[in-house]
Amino acid sequence: MALERTFSIIKPNAVANNDIGAIYARFERAGFKIIAAKMLHLTKEQAEGFYAEHKGRPFFDGLVEFMTSGPIMVQVLEGENAVQRHRDIMGATNPDNALAGTLRADFSDSFTANAVHGSDAVESAQREIAYFFAADEIFPRS
């Protein structure tokens, strides 16, 4: 198994519902180390830039509106096979299809307000981490 980093967002609905601590506890119980974290309120420009690959798709404007509706938590998780394992604990994008006990099954309010985002590949994790964190904001721990 390979030690990897992945990028994670706790979305506005989960922040508003005061679920940050519960979600962080799940990350840590799953063996992840949180090596960078911060709270921010995305501007429209930041959200459009982050989700640029989805521009022109029918859900894009609603996604940007939702992601700018309140504060979010962004974090870098480190662990063995972090990208896939994080996707496994998040559950299906549509919370109606998410397995019981996954983050989306437990903390989502709707398809758009599905509580969390996670990188889908090592390459996207690197890009997404760099979008929100400078190298000196990441603190690996042994």
From Swiss-Prot:
Gene Ontology terms: cellular component: cytoplasm
Q: Which cofactor does it need?
A: Mg(2+)
Q: Name one GO molecular function term.
A: metal ion binding
Q: Which UniProt keywords apply?
A: ATP-binding, Cytoplasm, Kinase, Magnesium, Metal-binding, Nucleotide metabolism, Nucleotide-binding, Phosphoprotein, Transferase
Name its cellular compartments. Cytoplasm
Q: What is this enzyme's EC?
A: 2.7.4.6
A Gene Ontology annotation in the biological process aspect, one of them, is: pyrimidine nucleotide metabolic process
Catalytic residues in the record: H117 (pros-phosphohistidine intermediate)
Q: What is the stated purpose of this protein?
A: Major role in the synthesis of nucleoside triphosphates other than ATP. The ATP gamma phosphate is transferred to the NDP beta phosphate via a ping-pong mechanism, using a phosphorylated active-site intermediate.
Q: What is the protein named?
A: Nucleoside diphosphate kinase
